[in-house]
Amino acid sequence: MAPTSSFPHQGLYVITKEGSSNIDLLRAHVQGALRGGARVVQYRAKRAAHPLLEAQALLEVCRTQGVPLLINDDIDLCLKIGADGVHIGHEDEKLKVARNRLGPHAIIGVSCYNSVDRALSAQEDSANYVAFGRFFPSSTKPNAPQADIDTLTLARQELSVPIVAIGGVTAENGVMLLEAGADLLAVIEGVFGAPNPEAAARRYNQLWSPT
């Protein structure tokens, strides 16, 4: 499979909230985030009632805006709807399986938590980007391992693929993550937990395009 959109080198990376059963609301929230400047959308379907329908709806939205849609940890769903790629855990074999099944042009991102060595291994095994975190307290994954901001600096020196920072990222603390070496900031609650996802996305987007 070949993605219709390439993975960006910087910008806001939004991840949908789990457990939503309203496809129209999910679509509207993602549309708002894209209007606000989001550059990547990841769909998380672990507790979704209708993952296929939701993913198809979001793919249509993302295609319209020329933004890649990635599926969280579900290669089958990615293939079924023709999404641009997947985001997976750090397991070496899972990355190899994903690349074999999705092909050389699919976008594949890997969670590396606080390990630059893991990120280097993922890069060597053809990951298109790596993600580190959580950096700050997170309501989505409160028990996720803590990552050190210094990890971003070391990763920036060692890696050539884009670096994503995740975990409790706000428009305020995101500055230090970008200064430390992150290229993209991944956000869930900060955008989709806000009253106005479009306005929230715009606030984050100012970190790359200050006025």
Model-based region annotation:
Residues 135:
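Conserved sequence/active-site signature of Rossmann-fold short-chain dehydrogenase/reductase
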Residues 180, 184-187:
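C-terminal binding/interaction regions
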Residues 93-96, 138-139:
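A short, polar/charged loop-to-alpha-helix boundary motif
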Residues 132, 140-145:
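Phosphate-binding beta-alpha-beta segment of Rossmann-like dinucleotide-binding domains, i.e.
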Residues 1-92, 100-128, 144-147, 154, ...:
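Conserved N-terminal beta1-alpha1 strand-loop-helix module at the mouth
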